[in-house]
Amino acid sequence: MNNFKTLLTACVLAGIGLSVPSTSSAQVSAADSVMNHANKQKLSVGGYGEVTYSREFFSDNVYRYSKASAYKNDPSHGKFDIPHAVIYLSYDFGKGWTMGSEIEFEHGGTGASYEKEYEESGEWEQEVEKGGEVELEQFWIQKSFSRSLNVRFGHIVVPIGLTNAHHEPLNFFTVYRPEGEATIFPCTWHQTGASLWGVLGKFRYEVQLLAGLNALSFSRDNWIQKGGTTAFEFEPSNKYAVALRIDNYSIPGLRLGISGYYGHSIDNSLGREASKEANSRNLKGAVTIGTFDFTYNAHNWIVRGNFDYGHLGDANDVRLLTGRQTKTSPFNRDYVGKAAMATGIEAG
């Protein structure tokens, strides 16, 4: 979208923010975002960006949650940020064939930075990035047979939960993306795979076949959030997953959506070190997610809400496998919860 959102606000504990008012696009799926800006032209270029300022009235110490009483009186801290700057590029080849891409610069791009790691007892750790990254978030080719039947292959957005399905900055009131879903799920969740989608009456559906997540990247702080990323030049695909999303628009101004995900995550990395043990003990690390979300946009009100629940099978065994990683391994050596839940609502 050709909108530039600038936020200059104080962020108080829960992340309450003010944004520049504009026409909401919350009814639009992120999976369609590139083509929605094509304007029926052969070649289309678009994009958006965010510049934010926030002040957080809580400690930035890595132990602020585990030892809350010791740091409850720490001073506040502020920061400027460029969470996302995105460039869209699409091309219509004709006869139902289209190509779409989305390049995203997060937090100012790449470089080198230091951060304090909770898992390393608060030690400084250097990352080969500048607190951000450059990602190819979408890159696909699509064949449209009709409004109700489209097939898409390539790198696609996985629309699990409200935030992933509607992640553009005018689709939430907070300065940053809502913390619940953004903490436990990959966000924006994008992987390489195949998608079948379409619109049937008042319903929009999408079914995806994807590579499974990597259990070695799960953690106690962020559950499966890092499971969709890869430290390699490719994405290991020893295991597979399916994702489903259905949205209903029967009531004017109201969108109701459900989404689900199921896939195995153990033995889905380079080398397949866990293959023998996983097979002998029938370990799968099955990730199961179910979500419900809604958006109401009418009568000068916008209301959004979501409820998400996820379960990880063989969670204790994931810890045993990650604990065997060497110190030079890019993976976590951490416990991970067997379940996670996020819920939220906003209105304005």
Tell where the protein language model's regions lie, with residue ranges:
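Acidic/histidine-rich helix-loop elements
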Residues: 64-65, 72, 76
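Outer membrane beta-barrel
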Residues: 34-57, 75-215, 238-243, 247-255, ...
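Short, basic, glycine/proline-bearing loop/turn elements
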Residues: 71, 123-124, 275-279
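N-terminal periplasmic/intermembrane-space "pro-region" immediately following the signal or transit peptide
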Residues: 2-64
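Outer-membrane beta-barrel translocator domains and adjoining extracellular loop/strand segments
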Residues: 57-64, 111-118, 132-134, 165-170, ...
